[in-house]
Amino acid sequence: MEKSKNFRIDALLAVDPPRAASTQSAPLALVTSLATTVSGPGRGGSGGGGTSSGASRSCSPASSEATAAPGDRLRAESPSPPRLLAAHCALLPKPGFLGAGGGGGAAGGPGTPHHHAHPGAAAAAAAAAAAAAAGGLALGLHPGGAQGGAGLPAQAALYGHPVYSYSAAAAAAALAGQHPALSYSYPQVQGAHPAHPADPIKLGASTFQLDQWLRASTAGMILPKMPDFSCEAQSNLLGKCRRPRTAFTSQQLLELEHQFKLNKYLSRPKRFEVATSLMLTETQVKIWFQNRRMKWKRSKKAKEQAAQEAEKQKGGGGGTGKGGSEEKTEEELMGPPVSGDKASGRRLRDLRDSDPDEDEDDEEEDNFPYSNGAGAHAASSDCSSEDDSPPPRLGGPGHQPLPQ
């Protein structure tokens, strides 16, 4: 019976290793093989007593059970999820256990390099991390390093910044020992691109200055607006704002002069026709005719005064004395004195016969200056009368005294 039991145990021992190897998944086998290759220098330097490396100690649940007993190997045929998770060396411990994991990795072999790893070891660590990611991402795990001590620097080198919060000194030491091609940290990116503004405070200040300059220029502080000369200068000089002069063309002036020779006053239909033909407004035509009539009346009055002076000079040379001739002419012009009723009636008759536009023209002359030597712009008069000459004045040469 004992021989048969021993035979069965030997048979089980002979058959179990292939079964245990077959039940092992492909990613797990790849991770364990890479972990043993990375921890090779530690084994070579430690001799016979250093056969168990840091990676094998980090995978202690699987390795200890594999060497414990044949009964435990039978149980390993159907590995449970906790054991499978523990068998993966790519698991990253919690932040509180980082020191313990690093210590275990350091105690794996006395000759195992950690902080001063060569580029070959860094490449092997990166390959182990990639293999662990292939097996661990399917289970929703975060990819980490292949060994306990070197997993943290490899992860920091691949991702540029630590996933878990640990000390800045450990991060700097981990980044300093890795290959430059694998480091994507923020300080190295800053050094690789010195042309870009690295200081956000300086960038904000320059942007603020540019924004302030644009706002000030649009508000008229840096680029002042042109002043309005049409109203400000005249209001300071004359006390009121006046419109700028209308510049008539030579063709418009010729046509207006022609219409003025035909008729001194324009009716509304005629004024509308002239304004439409000359591409002017009715107000411009009206004001031009009004100012032109005032100019014509002044010139006519000046001619009459010149004729009176010439007649006075002729009469003064052939008569008695200059003073007597003047008194005589005044008496002849004025006639004998009349009673109060007749004088008042004559005064009313003179007011009725006077030109109604004369007073209006005198008022409008100050408000609307001439545009050039020929004429000016203007406001219209609605009256259309054919009288070209003003009513006779009392002192004029053509006035005769009323019969008594």
UniProtKB/Swiss-Prot annotation:
Modified residues (Phosphoserine): S78, S80
Gene3D superfamilies: Homeodomain-like
Keyword DNA-binding among UniProt keywords: yes
InterPro entries referenced in this protein's UniProt entry, alphabetically: HD, HD_metazoa, Homeobox_CS, Homeodomain-like_sf, MNX1/Ceh-12
Protein name: Motor neuron and pancreas homeobox protein 1
Source species, domain of life: Eukaryota
Gene Ontology biological process terms in this record: cell morphogenesis involved in neuron differentiation; central nervous system neuron differentiation; diaphragm development; dorsal/ventral neural tube patterning; endocrine pancreas development; motor neuron axon guidance; negative regulation of transcription by RNA polymerase II; nerve development
Biased composition (Acidic residues): 355-367
Gene Ontology MF annotations: DNA binding; DNA-binding transcription factor activity, RNA polymerase II-specific
PANTHER family to which the protein is assigned, alphabetical: MOTOR NEURON AND PANCREAS HOMEOBOX PROTEIN, MOTOR NEURON AND PANCREAS HOMEOBOX PROTEIN 1
UniProt modified residues of type N-acetylmethionine: M1
Record's keyword annotation contains Transcription regulation: yes
CDD domains according to UniProt: homeodomain
Start-end of Gly residues biased regions: 41-52
Summary of the knockout phenotype: Perinatal lethality and dorsal lobe of the pancreas fails to develop. Reduction in the size of the islets of Langerhans, probably as a result of fewer beta-cells. Additional ectopic V2 interneurons (V2-INs) at all axial levels of the spinal cord; phenotype exacerbated in an LMO4 mutant background. Genes typically expressed in V2-INs expressed ectopically in motor neurons (MNs); phenotype exacerbated in an LMO4 mutant background. Abnormal guidance of motor axons in an LMO4 mutant background.
Region entry Disordered, spans: 36-80, 299-404
Organism: Mus musculus (Mouse)
Keywords from the named record: Acetylation, Developmental protein, DNA-binding, Homeobox, Nucleus, Phosphoprotein, Transcription, Transcription regulation
Functional note: Transcription factor. Recognizes and binds to the regulatory elements of target genes, such as visual system homeobox CHX10, negatively modulating transcription. Plays a role in establishing motor neuron identity, in concert with LIM domain transcription cofactor LMO4. Involved in negatively modulating transcription of interneuron genes in motor neurons, acting, at least in part, by blocking interactions of ISL1-LHX3 complexes with regulatory elements. Involved in pancreas development and function; may play a role in pancreatic cell fate specification.
Primary location: nucleus
Bias-annotated ranges (Basic and acidic residues): 302-314, 343-354
GO cellular component, one term: nucleus
Tissue: Expressed in beta-cells in the islets of Langerhans, but not in the exocrine portion of adult pancreas (at protein level).
Entry's localization field: Nucleus
